[in-house]
Design a protein with these regions (language model features):
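Active-site and NAD+-binding cores of ADP-ribose-processing enzymes
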Residues: 1-22, 53-186
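Extended catalytic/binding region for NAD+/ADP-ribose chemistry, centered on the ART fold
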Residues: 23-55
Length: 186
């Protein structure tokens, strides 16, 4: 998911703009990041629907009309910190303490991303973090570190794209949201 504006693509890393997130921003200067979802539903839930209550609500055009989705293909194996399953147990934490928290905990959770970034070994270190999406917990979410994952490491798939502000993609969003008690205002 990305904002479809001049100069932005699905493979563009955020250089440190915007409000704090679960795993960004850290470092001085900030390490650029790219968030991604394993499925389109997870990506939508983690972005467009992120701030709506679990019980539903209204989604306004300014919240989705400039948003697009694309699929990314990795050109090399990425090394990711596993903040899910037994990865959490190895770190002696639970999802409720790290990946299933409210935004009030972001100043604390971002430190885990910084710690993953600080891991160094003969291969250079970790490329990002993987966890179960809080908003769609049957799919993984990812944050990639822009100083480790370069432009040659990601490819935008040519067989998938959505632009949520119009046509069939808006209809898809309306259908998905309706099942969640969310009214998409057009």
């Amino acid at each position: 998911m990305f904002t479809a504006r001049a100069g932005r693509t699905a493979a563009s890393f955020n250089p440190g703009w915007g409000a704090p997130t679960r795993f960004a921003f850290f470092g001085e200067p900030p390490v650029p990041v790219l968030y991604a979802g394993e499925t389109e539903e997870a990506a939508v839930a983690e972005t467009i629907l992120h701030d709506l209550p679990a019980g539903g609500g209204d989604l306004y055009p300014e919240d989705y009309r400039d948003t697009a989705a694309a699929a990314l293909v990795t050109r090399r194996a990425l090394r990711l910190a596993a903040l899910h399953g037994l990865g959490l147990r190895r770190l002696a934490v639970t999802a409720a303490q790290l990946t299933d928290t409210s935004s009030a905990e972001y100043p604390r959770t971002v430190a885990w991303s910084g710690a993953a970034h600080a891991v160094r070994d003969d291969d250079g270190g970790l490329d990002g973090v993987c966890w179960m999406s809080r908003q769609c917990n049957n799919a993984k979410a990812y944050v990639l570190f822009g100083d480790r994952v370069g432009p040659d490491d990601l490819e935008i798939a040519t067989d998938y794209a959505r632009i949520f502000g119009v046509g069939a993609d808006l209809d898809w969003l309306i259908d998905l949201a309706a099942g969640l008690g969310i009214n998409v205002m057009v």
